[in-house]
Amino acid sequence: MYATFLLAVGALALCSGRVQANPQLMSEVDTQAATEVSYANFQQWLRDFRQYAAGQGISEATLNKALDGVRYRERVIELDGYQPEFVRPIWEYLDTAVSSTRITNGQEKLADHRNTAQQMEQRYGVPAEIIVAIWGIESNYGSNFGDFSTLESLATLAYDGRRRDFARGELLAALRIIDQGDIAAEDMKGSWAGAMGHTQFIPSSFEAYAVDGDGDGRRDIWDSIPDVMASTANYLDRAGWQSGQPWGVEVRLPEGFDYAQTERRSSAEWRNQGVQAQQGELPNFDSAAIVIPAGANGPAFLVGANFRAILRYNNATSYALAVATLGDAIAGREGIQHSWPRDQAPLTRDDVQELQRALNRVGYSVGGADGVMGPNTRQGLRNFQRDQGLIPDGFATQELLEQLRQRSQ
């Protein structure tokens, strides 16, 4: 009715000889019309998906409970398309992720649930402080795991998101979880992206790794701390966690160290190159890599299989380092000793895209200019640095960007 009224206003304007339409009114008409079309298309998509899910064995009762009333969520699409202007430096991320408050709260949570955490440590070989650290990073110990309907988020993303096939598969997995009785449809809550519960499992990860830790017959990562801890420990165990080994250690690198080395070596081989632990001795790793997340001017770490297991949970070096160092802090161990290069101005996403285009132009192929400092971009940057007689650490700075600008003109 509102749209009809607006169209009538436009018709009266034309009759009176005023041919310029009101932009605000026309914008409201366009927006409402687009919303109505999108809603109708979404409902048709949902009906089609419902038939598909039924063909995959989801019961009619579950489909009724889970999909009746599911709505398209514009906010989910807004968040899916959000790209921050600046590439956040790792030290700023760690300042928040491993804050003194989070450390204290983690120690309190470990004290509150020590028996459960130790049981899971004995069962899976994953230290209690690492289990609690993932809990802290993922949802701030359960205080913020999201209040989005997982079903609505995934349905919206499957219909209109950037990774539609992926979201469609996760939506089907969510329906299977409900069908199996682990959680009621209305209680399946989490992030806008479909990650669920205290430690933010996506539905397919829930199916693969969730564990009934309290023996009540359900895998409940929303309300059962034993299930949360068992599921998290099981995930890391299945990802290759090696019991009795540390995640890694902060190290000192010798003068003249070749920062371009990306391959794994044994601790003995690294030791022969002059790599030393900041404190004590190097752990006995069979296969370990040097990680320098802020380049040659920042801290360096020798990381082994357990660091790689954390990366399986979230494939970002900053995330894995946050979990590892938060776990250390919860257990009372010292934190990172070397200072971060906080005087380095962060690059914007546009800066990174410009850097990628410049590398491509001067012969260091890094693929598309997506504004993300991925492995191809870092390798291309290392090659450029080496050819320029610079330390090939692959760390992008404003100074390097300016050099590339000049070279690529």
Whereabouts are the PLM-identified features?
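Signal peptide-directed extracytoplasmic domains
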Residues: 70-113, 119
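Extracytoplasmic and endomembrane cell-envelope/extracellular-matrix remodeling and assembly machinery
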Residues: 33-70, 77-84, 103, 157-194, ...
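Short, conserved phosphate-binding/catalytic loop or strand-edge motifs used
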Residues: 137, 148-155
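Short acidic, glycine/serine/threonine-rich helix-capping segments at coil-helix boundaries
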Residues: 347-352, 360-404
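Active-site-adjacent structural elements in enzyme catalytic domains
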Residues: 109-139
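Boundary at the C-terminal end of the N-terminal hydrophobic targeting segment
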Residues: 19-23
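Bacterial N-terminal signal peptides
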Residues: 4-15
